[in-house]
């Protein structure tokens, strides 16, 4: 493996500036779910220029694509994302909340880094395949709409991963370690009520309030929370209250629900009960109700064999060396965080490493930027979050790591993260992830026994728990409204 590590390290460092430029350019063009046309084409055309064969409009999603190089088996996929979040515009390298354009988008989850690291890994693996004449195929999967859109779930449904043997990805974090926990499955759907408008004082008896129906539905689901499993979550947002005039009986209103639980069967059960509450609310108010299924994703299925192989590569490369300017800026960011933010970050570290992870987290209570790789241990912990990587993981072996791109304590989906996402701190973490994925991919090409063991582990689970795509066939991806 030492020769592989040297080759990958040299290959990625040789193009270091190119990769940081691409990450920054995507940061400069933040686009939300299923509207990432600039970002997708930027990556696709760059891969095309690098000698990859690019297929666009994959899975009937205009900004999803596959870039492929090589021939035959095995086929190893590197999963890239590039979507941003609404309302998180923020100036880069600034330790106070200062938007570039108020109310506009920002890369609050570091997906400008996520997609670029997978891009860099794919280029490095291509160079290795060319250098050594090794058989096999490396693919970059351009996956839009992770944030609230479950883009990969739609892609899985359309069969675009059917011939893939294994997949690797990563996520920007405040520490270096493995993403080795289960996640929550979810369903997101909206209920739109229609009633009859009327003068709220003169003729309220003639009106039928859609807003009342939404209020009754939210009240009912809040009572339902007492009667669902402990690890389930039911979130909602009233996306249309009917208007701003209280003297009108509101003729339309809408509420969006996100239902989560460790298993999709539990999510589906809760979803069915919420749907009945909606019907009851419509009945009580003499309104009509229409449900629009938005998206869903499955829980994440870890593959311990592949995780171990990826962890070996991550441990070899180790955490980046930070300079005094980076440490000083990270301290400024930490000064804006709460003690709860910091503790939550440490809890996330601890959750991935068993008992050693807890000791590791305690040791790093005062750490500014991660300076060692967190321990790895197979764990039954469930991360209280969701990812559409979950659906890929039920189709084939998947492993993913975390890489340090932010100050310890930085919460996801915040201005602090956006600010750090276009700095040398983020760039260093991104390139560590790229090297880790590339080296693990080469290892899979060379070690057929390793790949077979990964697939056997995967099959042992899916033989007894077969995968069913949670998104109905008639549902199509929808941009953020």
From Swiss-Prot:
- Tell me the cofactors it needs: Mn(2+)
Q: Which GO terms describe its molecular function?
A: dipeptidase activity; para-aminobenzoyl-glutamate hydrolase activity; protein heterodimerization activity
A GO cellular component entry from the record: catalytic complex
User: Keywords assigned by UniProt?
Assistant: Hydrolase
- EC id: 3.5.1.-
The first-level EC class reads: hydrolase
Pfam families, alphabetically? M20_dimer, Peptidase_M20
Highest taxon listed in the record's lineage: Bacteria
Q: Which GO terms describe its biological process?
A: folic acid catabolic process
Keyword Hydrolase in record: yes
Q: What induces it?
A: Could be transcriptionally regulated by AbgR.
Keyword Lipid metabolism (UniProt):
no
Protein task: Component of the p-aminobenzoyl-glutamate hydrolase multicomponent enzyme system which catalyzes the cleavage of p-aminobenzoyl-glutamate (PABA-GLU) to form p-aminobenzoate (PABA) and glutamate. AbgAB does not degrade dipeptides and the physiological role of abgABT should be clarified.
Q: What do we know about how this protein assembles, alone or with others?
A: Forms a heterodimer with AbgA.
Name it: p-aminobenzoyl-glutamate hydrolase subunit B
Name the source organism: Escherichia coli (strain K12)
